[in-house]
UniProtKB/Swiss-Prot annotation:
This is Proton-coupled zinc antiporter SLC30A9, mitochondrial. It comes from Mus musculus. It comes from the Eukaryota. The lineage of its organism: Eukaryota, Metazoa, Chordata, Craniata, Vertebrata. InterPro entries: Cation_efflux (IPR002524), Cation_efflux_TMD_sf (IPR027469), DNA-bd_dom_put_sf (IPR009061), SLC30A9 (IPR040177), XPA_sf (IPR037129). The gene is Slc30a9. Keywords: Antiport, Endoplasmic reticulum, Ion transport, Membrane, Mitochondrion, Nucleus, Transcription, Transcription regulation, Transmembrane, Transmembrane helix, Transport, Zinc, Zinc transport.
Length: 567
């Protein structure tokens, strides 16, 4: 009936569903201009098929053509055609295929295990450690009570011990409540013990005083104390020599002023008196500076030298310069005739020799100290590295110059008979003392404010830390001079976490660690594993800090206090 259609169907052997998909794929680019109809054309016959599925694209024209097959000398022959499905069957086949469920792979979703965040609150003390001494003192416990508690070994913050035993504060508090029953009973016991401690200290003080009196009565010789031995060498020796010489000069200058009435001699007498008082103050500062640190002063009392030197500078200005200016101005306003100046010249000559000897002692001490510090004499004096000897040097220099000024002005007065020259000498000595006091006030104030050490020394300390493998960088370096050759060093250290972790792993058993890793199956087990080794790594980091501090102090003995902060 339709030989062309039958021949095409037998040749291609394709399903209608495939043809429909082919036509739909080609029609996807043509838009949806055909609306809701699908057009299928077989040669000259066209059928309209309704759109039965929303996902089926519009099928445009699909045409099948017949083919003439020539064999030998025969004419065209038409092959036997298979049964062609009807239009209704074709539509039903297409609808059934489209309605069939699509095969999809199962959807796999990765669920992220998240550790629940803990709320520690504003105050959390369950992980605080406390030493045995604090537990006994603060909670009124006995050593036997602590034996039943958990003991934990931790790194010691002191250089003399590697580690020490601590207890959990929560365990100690629970034990205290078990022993005393309530917080009120514990508070009452602490109050009673505090009163007993005060009474014990009072009895101890009385007993020590009785022992001192008994020792003095028997003439018992005690070992020389540190405060006494410090005056036998170094700056203490210079101060004691200056006190003795200036005391004698002050006495003889006052006698000369009383005998002659000279304003210049009065200024020199006041000058020697102020020097003697100030040097006594320096001796007190030196004695105080060598005291051992206590809980109230953990960094010691080395700044007492700067404080005493500062007060000495103020005293020189008020007593020495002030009185000299006053007496010189009064001499200019109300000149008085003077007696013979022979004795005054003799006393000034003796003063020049004695003050010069003290000046040489101070210069030699400063030169020796400057060589020990590796700096020049001038720089050592200007930076006031040794405040006590510095004061002696400046005072004796001013004393020698003052004697020369006073002798010159008194000589002019003797030659001319004009007392105004003597008053001008008093003003000159006062001005000299004012300059010395201003220099002392400035240098000691700078030292008390916290003066940095030499830049070369800071660079050397920084390079020592940076050369360590566990350190990445050093920031915010502060190195201050505490006096008495003591240095405080502070820096923020950026540690290399890989090196610190490797240092920890080198001390671990890898087989045991691998076994622990294989046993981790749940988030809780992973948390326990990480907490265990994380805490140990933090302890390793603290040990690295302690090691660097000890190394820094060992190579630089002048560095007494080191504060390394982890960045």
């Amino acid at each position: 009936m339709f030989p062309g259609l039958a021949a095409a169907a037998a040749a291609h052997r394709c399903s209608w569903a495939a043809l429909c998909r082919l036509g739909g794929g080609r029609a996807a680019t043509r838009g949806r201009s055909q609306g809701w109809k699908n057009v299928m054309t077989f040669e000259s016959f066209t059928y309209v098929v309704p759109d039965i599925h929303p996902h089926l694209s519009i099928i445009n024209q699909v045409k099948l053509y017949s083919t003439n097959v020539q064999k030998g000398g025969q004419g065209s022959q038409t092959p036997k055609a298979d049964k062609v499905p009807s239009l209704t069957q074709t539509v039903e086949n297409i609808g059934a295929e489209l309605k069939a469920p699509l095969k999809q792979d199962p959807l796999q979703v990765r669920v992220k295990a998240v550790l629940k965040k803990r709320d520690y609150g504003s105050k959390y003390t369950k992980n605080n450690f406390i030493t045995g001494v604090r537990a006994i003192n603060e909670f009124c416990l006995k050593s036997s009570d602590l034996e039943q508690l958990r003991k934990i070994r931790r790194r010691s913050p002191h250089d003399d011990t590697e580690s020490f035993t601590v207890f959990l504060r929560s365990d100690v508090e629970a034990k205290a409540l078990e022993v005393w029953g309530s917080l009120e009973a514990l508070a009452r016991e602490k109050k009673l013990r505090k009163e007993a401690e005060i009474e014990y200290r009072e009895r101890l003080f009385r007993n020590q005083r009785i022992l001192r009196e008994y020792g003095d009565f028997l003439g018992n010789t005690k070992p020389r104390s540190r405060a006494v031995s410090v005056f036998l060498k170094g700056p203490g020796k210079v101060v004691m020599v200056a006190i003795c010489i200036n005391g004698l000069n002050c006495f003889f200058k006052f006698l000369a002023w009383i005998y002659t009435g000279s304003a210049s001699m009065f200024s020199e007498a006041i000058h020697s008196l102020s020097d003697t008082c100030n040097q006594g103050l320096l001796a007190l500062g030196i004695s105080k500076s060598v005291q051992t640190p206590d809980p109230s002063h953990p960094y010691g009392f080395s700044n007492m030298r700067y404080i005493s030197s500062l007060i000495s500078g103020v005293g020189i200005f008020m007593m020495g310069a002030g009185l000299s200016w006053y007496h010189g101005i009064m001499g200019l306003l109300h000149p008085q005739p003077m007696e013979s100046l022979l004795w005054a010249y003799c006393i000034l000559a003796g003063s020049l020799v004695s003050e010069g000897a003290t000046l040489l002692v101070a210069i030699n001490e400063l030169r020796r100290s400057a060589q020990a510090k590796g700096t020049t004499f001038y720089k050592y004096v200007m930076e006031s590295r040794d405040p006590s000897t510095n004061v002696i040097l400046l005072e004796d220099t001013a004393a020698v110059l003052g004697v020369i000024i006073a002798a010159t002005c008194m000589g002019l007065t003797s030659i001319t008979g004009n007392p105004l020259y003597d008053s001008l000498g008093s003003l000159g000595v006062g001005t000299l003392l004012g300059v010395v006091s201003a220099f002392l006030i400035y240098t000691n104030t700078e030292a008390l404010l916290g003066r940095s050490i030499q830049p070369e020394q800071v660079q050397r300390l920084t390079e020592l830390l940076e050369s360590d493998p566990s350190v990445r960088a050093i920031h915010d370096v502060k190195a201050t001079d505490l006096g008495l050759g003591k240095v405080r060093f502070k820096a923020e250290v950026d540690f290399d976490g890989r090196v610190v972790t490797r240092s920890y792993l080198e001390k671990q058993d890898f087989d045991q660690m691998m076994q622990e890793i294989q046993e981790v199956k749940t988030p809780e087990q992973l948390e326990a594993f990480m907490l265990k080794h994380g805490e140990n790594i933090i302890d390793t980091l603290g040990a690295e800090v302690d090691r660097l501090e000890k190394e820094l102090k060992k190579r630089n003995p002048e560095v007494r206090h080191v504060d390394l902060e982890i960045l």
